[in-house]
Amino acid sequence: MTFTEYMGFFQDKYELICMADEERDNFCLDVESSWNITNMVLLDEATWPTYTNKCYYDVSGITEQVWINMRLNINIIPANNYTASENINITIASPGPITTICPQAITISQNTTLTCQQMAIAYEIPTAGIRNLKIISIAIGVAAVNGTNPTTSNTTATFVSAPTTTVTGTTSECCEWHTVFSGDTCQLIEAEYGITLEKFIALNTYVNSTCGNIWPDYAYCVSGIATANSSTSTTAITATSTSPPIPVTTSGTLTTATTSGTITTPAPAQTGMVSGCTTFYEAISGDGLLRDRHIVRHHA
C-alpha cells in the first residue's frame, strides 16, 4: 500500500466520509464494530451523511461491511471491490436518487477561513471530494483553507479607484478601500477586513510600523497587491512623520513665487506661519488639513 493509499484509508476510518449513527454520532470504525451492517443492508437501513452529496469515491482499502453500505448508497463506476475481505452474497436493494454531477470547483467567499469539515458541510461534498477538487478559487487577500494547500484559479482581479484622496506609497492595484474616520485605529481596520498589520503596511507603505500616522478622510487599501508602485516614503514627508501626508490627488491650488525671494502670505492662513516662504498650498475638504487655511510647502 502506498503512502497516499494509506492516508486515504486513514481518513476513511476517522473522518466524516462513511456513514453516521445520528443517535450516537459514531463513524466508520465504530460503525464496523457496533452495527450489523449485513442486516441493515437487507432492511434497507444503511445510511450516508445527510449533509453530503453521494459522489464518486475511492473505496480502496475499505472493509467489506463499509463497501456494502456504499454500494447501496452510491453508483460507483467501475463497481470493483478492492478489499481483501470475502464477498458476502446477498441481494442489495436498488439505490434511490443519486447525485451524479459532483462539483469540480468551488469558490470561497472573501475573508473566509474554513476547515475541511466545515467546507464539507457548507458545500455539501465529502471531505474526500474536497481533496479531489480541480480548483479552489480564493479571492485576493483571503486566508487559505486550514490544513490544505489549494491550487488557486487564474482569475483576473478587478481593481477599483480610491473613493477619496490617497497618500504616496499606496498601491494602485487595490480591490477594496477603507476611508479613515476620526477614532479609527489599525486594530479596528484589521478586525473589520481580516487583514494583518504587515499586509496593511505593504499596501500602504506610507504607514509606519506602529500605525501611528493614518489620517481621517484619506483612503487606504485593505485588499490588493503590493507592487512597485508602492513607495517606502514621500518626497516631502517621511514615513515616520506625525504630520498629515501630502496627498497624491487633490483639486487644491498652489501659489508659487515667480521670481526669487518670498511672496506675500495669502489669507486666510493659520497662526505660526514661517517667514521666507516661496510656495503655498490651499487646503481643501478631504485633505486632512485645516479647511480654508494656507499651509507652507517650501520655505527658504
From Swiss-Prot:
The LysM (lysin motif) domains are small globular domains involved in binding chitin in eukaryotes. LysM1 contains one LysM domain. This is Non-secreted LysM effector LysM16. It comes from the Eukaryota. InterPro entries: LysM1-like, LysM_dom, LysM_dom_sf. Keywords: Chitin-binding, Virulence. Pfam families: LysM (PF01476). GO terms for molecular function: chitin binding. In plants, chitin acts as a microbe-associated molecular pattern (MAMP) that is recognized by lysin motif (LysM)-containing plant cell surface-localized pattern recognition receptors (PRRs) that activate a plethora of downstream immune responses.
